[in-house]
Structure formats: structure tokens, C-alpha cells
């Protein structure tokens, strides 16, 4: 039996990152809404509890509290951001509105030699104070410590940025240790989970495979499953996992909606029919999809339409399978949280995902989402453990709506053709260009990354079609053609991301090739936006 961490979600967009960090420490955890019953908390029997952040205010929303059982169990508790504030309020402290709200990078001074922060620091001040580089996101602040607590961290604008009652194992921080922007955040969470809570690091991917296979078999029984195969990492790993569980009860439906990458259909059929020996039905539905997208410019509507058409195609195929009762999808955690579809339903919706937002309530098939609680890097790890080839597992993510969300505004077949060719050139150049010692010296990559392709050094890269024209000169003639933007990001979890600092020579080659080889394009720009504030996809 694995030790378990209970994460209570108050509605933060990054609650799932807490789970990711706990799992990186090889400790099992589950996320549940903050308003679960006291009986649930006791029956879960956690070794420790973590309280997440929230977009709410502790003194405006008096219902958003942790169950009393959290404080009665006698296990360590870690409060993060809002979790710190509700801990303070519920245990007799004081929270008030801050005159100076903090959103973004901050430097926090550590105090008091607590077990949580002992020997963890990023730098020291000339006065010898240990400092932490962290990520803040709060409008309220703790103004008075609860009885039994001592100060653990502070900033000039947030005098109580961390507090601890070590006798009871209660710790709280105003910043977010779960995000990558907090330099020592992973170390702090490991200290809490392994050191303070005493959890055994014995949860590994092979355990997850066994549990997932058993769960799929229990859910599905002898019924049949259809899965929408896109060729992307998520649907590929979902197909492999489900195929391991139920074999030929799974039928993969590969839908060509006219918005796929170059040569996608050929690659998908070779991989799944040739390698996995899975049942794959190939459907060309490009006319159907493009017809319904004609004249539609709103990105939310495009996603909804693509999701709806996918469902209709699946339902039509399911009718041919007498025992098909399940629709499987490669939905992963970032899809769910960006759609406001976490287990708590409290996260603010950023955009609809075709996997979750596009499904009608009247869907005639039950939904099977075996990757719903996994992050992208976990999905890749799972794929390797399932024996999938590296070229499949480490392929860059591709959204279910395909080029439909990479063509701004109305989707047209000729726009898709232009974008497909530009995107293929960009990816080809990334694959064949290796990082050099000069790149490392310039700070574009780490020294141990020299010799790796820039495709492998980026987490996701693609081209975006902009439906605007600009003036250009080709030879002796004037051109008036379309623009494409190149986008490349680096991230570990896809919840936050940095734009990739690619070598200028590489970007120059991409631009020259695209303009010279793709008739109809005469300008190439590079996107230097991070996430946040931008999302990775443009729509």
C-alpha cells in the first residue's frame, strides 16, 4: 500500500502542478475539492495534506474553507497561497486585504531555521540573510499569526510570507513552490513530503500502468471502445495503454479533418497498423470539417465546431460496432484545467479544449480518459514504459483541432496548405540543426545540451498563419502576400512556458526557406511571448 498525500483544491489554475511535484518525488497523491466531507478525509487516510491556492479571497468567501478533519487528523499540513490564508483564519490568525498586491517574481527572506526551509536558499544578502527566488500571486495577506505559529518567511510588502507551527507539523507559504519560477520550490515540496511527512518514495510509472490497466478493464468489461487517433503523443499513449488492457476490444478511428500536419496520415497508419498491430479505421472527413468551419472566425466557436464534428464522426463509426459503448480520448491535465474542468470545477476557464469543451451532454457513448490525471512529461514516461518508439513518444504536442487553431480567423483549405508547408520547413530545420558550443557560450543552451537537435531542445514548435498581407519584394517585382509566425517554447509541464531562444542563424534559414519555397508567403515573424501572459497556442 502506497503512502498518500491529499491535495485539497480551492480553485487554483496550478493545483495540478502540486500533484506533479509530489509525483516527481515518487509519492502517490490525489486532488480533491476543498469541500469534501470530514469522513472522506479520514477514510482517505493521508500521510499529509496540502492546501492549494485560489483566485478567491479568504475574507470575501467565507465558505471556501478546509474541512475540520484536516486539523483533527494529526498529520502534517502545508498551505500554499490561499491555503496559507485559510489556515491562518481557521486556526485563529488574521487575514486582510493587501495594499500592495504581488503577482510575479519576488525575493523572500527565510526566517527561523524551520524544518521546511532549513539550508534551502538561493542567495545571501550582504547582511547574511538567506533569500529565496519565488513566484507570488496574491491580493490578501496574513496580518496576524495564529496561536502557536512562528514567522518563517517575509518580504517588504508581505511581512508574513511564511509561517510554521512545527509542534503540529503545520507549514504555510504565501508564494507558489509548485511552479518552476520558484527556484527551490521542488526541493521545498520534497522536504515536506519525504522529510516532514515521512512518505516512502515508492510510486513509479509501472505501478500506474498496472493500476490504469486494471481500472480500464473494470470500467469497460467486455464492451468495445473507439478512440480518436490524431497521431499526437496523448492519443498515441492512450491507445497503447487501452490496447494493453483490452486488446482488440479497441478500435482506433483516425479522422483526417483537413487540418493535419504534412504527411500525418501516412505516419499514423505506419505507426499503429505496422507497429502496434491495432485496429485502425481511416476516415477522410476534410470536406465535412472545412464546410462547417466556413465563415467562422471566433476561436472558441472553431474549437466547439471541431469537437462537435469529431463526436459525430465517432458516433457514426460506433454504430458500425455493435458493442461499442465507450469513446476514449487522450485528455491530459492541462487540457482539463484550462477548460475549468478539474475535479473541483472551480478553476477559471481560459479556453475550451476540443476534448472536454466540445462534447455535448447528449453523447451516446461513455467517456474513457485514462490520461486525465497526467501531465505531458508523465505521458511521455508512460509511453516509454509501454514500449512505444521514441519518435512517437517524444514528438511535439499537436492540438486536437489541428491547424484550425493555428490559422487565425476563418479556416480555409488554401490557408491550411500554406501553413502545412511552412510548418514542415520549420520542424525540418529544428531537427537537423544541432546546438553548438557557441550556442552554449551565448547562453542559448546548457553545455550538456551541445550536440542535441533544437527540436529536442524545444518542448513545442510550430508555425501560425496570420490572415493579413504585407508588401514584399521578390526579384524585381512587388509582392503582397501572407505572414506566418514561428512559435517555439520550452517547458516541463505546459502549465507555464518560456519562449525558446533559438539561434539567429537557424531562424534566418527558416525564414529564407519559407519565403522562397512557399508561394503565397512573404514575411516570417518569431513569437517571443511566455506563458503566462500568453497561451502556447495562439487560439
UniProtKB/Swiss-Prot annotation:
InterPro entries: Class_I_gatase-like, GATASE, GMP_synth_C, GMP_synth_GATase, GMP_synthase, GMPS_ATP_PPase_dom, NAD/GMP_synthase, Rossmann-like_a/b/a_fold. Its EC number is 6.3.5.2. GO terms for molecular function: ATP binding; GMP synthase activity. The active site is at residues 81, 176, 178. ATP binds at residues 230-236. It catalyses: XMP + L-glutamine + ATP + H2O = GMP + L-glutamate + AMP + diphosphate + 2 H(+). Pathway: Purine metabolism; GMP biosynthesis; GMP from XMP (L-Gln route): step 1/1. The keyword Nucleotide-binding applies. Pfam families: GATase (PF00117), GMP_synt_C (PF00958), NAD_synthase (PF02540). Residues 4-202 form the Glutamine amidotransferase type-1 domain. It comes from the Bacteria. Homodimer. This is GMP synthase [glutamine-hydrolyzing]. The lineage of its organism: Bacteria, Pseudomonadati, Pseudomonadota, Betaproteobacteria, Burkholderiales.
